[in-house]
């Protein structure tokens, strides 16, 4: 399958996986739409894509705010054309502490990681239904497969994305609209570079983007990578609770996100 000439819109495009996806899809011949909060970074990325002969448009929005998210995505689509591929990539992460019990951070993660996906799809889905074709994708995480100490809010938000996309995929099966859930492992991005522990099978953002685009071309329903970490977490998901608790005891001492509020 070729993406040449198709319109692809990516949220959270100002850094990390979103930035790399935009460059990769532009190289594939897509007209690329960029949505994120940071205008300066979006302008830099748009300039880079245009320098290499690509077609690009961008708009700023806080993806956790419904009106902003829908308006920005539809504004970009109005300039580039009907959306063929929407990638809901925007996401945030923070530790879930118990002393104090940081409910505001959990709320923020659910607003961005879950509702941000819903709002993004809301902006593109009606147009796809009217045209009778399209592709919706969401970036989840391998962390969604197991509740991890210190990550309760993050892992729960990503698990919610998985279930939401699964149900939507079945609903849209007869509408000729593909739905893909992407679950990466550790990827070198601004969100993970603060981690104080060794990240197994760490990938660059460019490598992750290449793998994701390949999965989207194949219209994979769910794509988990790298396979080694995926296998480990899936085994942990079905392992006895007493064994998992023992395995995770050391992990519990070092939460994966910096202890700063979102």
Q: Residues of each region from the PLM?
A:
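The beta1-alpha1 cofactor-binding region of Rossmann-like NAD(H)/NADP(H)-dependent oxidoreductases
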Residues: 39, 60-71, 103
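Conserved glycine-rich cofactor-binding loop
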Residues: 7, 14-15
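Substrate-binding pocket helix/loop in short-chain dehydrogenase/reductase
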Residues: 97-110
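C-terminal helical subdomain
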Residues: 181, 197-232
């Amino acid at each position: 399958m070729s993406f040449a000439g198709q319109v692809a819109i990516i949220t959270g495009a100002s850094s990390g996986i979103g930035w790399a996806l935009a460059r990769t899809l532009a190289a594939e011949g897509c007209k690329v739409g960029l949505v994120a909060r940071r205008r300066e970074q979006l302008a830099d990325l748009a300039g880079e894509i245009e320098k290499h002969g690509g077609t690009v448009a961008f708009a700023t929005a806080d993806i956790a705010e419904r009106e902003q998210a829908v308006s920005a995505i539809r504004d970009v689509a109005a300039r580039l054309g009907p959306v063929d591929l929407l990638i809901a990539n925007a996401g945030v992460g923070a530790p879930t502490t118990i002393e104090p019990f940081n409910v505001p951070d959990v709320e923020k993660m659910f607003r961005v990681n879950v509702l941000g996906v819903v709002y993004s799809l809301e902006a593109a889905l009606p147009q796809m239904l009217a045209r009778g074709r399209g592709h919706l994708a969401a970036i989840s995480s391998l962390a969604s497969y197991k509740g991890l100490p210190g990550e309760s809010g993050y892992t729960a938000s990503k698990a919610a994305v998985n279930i939401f996309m699964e149900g939507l995929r079945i609903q849209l099966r007869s509408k000729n609209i593909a739905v893909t859930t992407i679950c990466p492992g550790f990827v070198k991005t601004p969100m993970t570079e603060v981690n104080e522990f060794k990240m197994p099978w760490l990938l660059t953002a460019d490598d992750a983007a290449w793998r994701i685009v390949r999965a989207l071309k194949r219209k994979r329903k769910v794509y988990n990578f790298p396979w080694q970490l995926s296998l480990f977490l899936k085994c942990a998901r079905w392992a006895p609770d007493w064994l998992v608790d023992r395995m995770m005891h050391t992990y519990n001492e070092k939460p994966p996100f910096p202890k700063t509020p979102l």
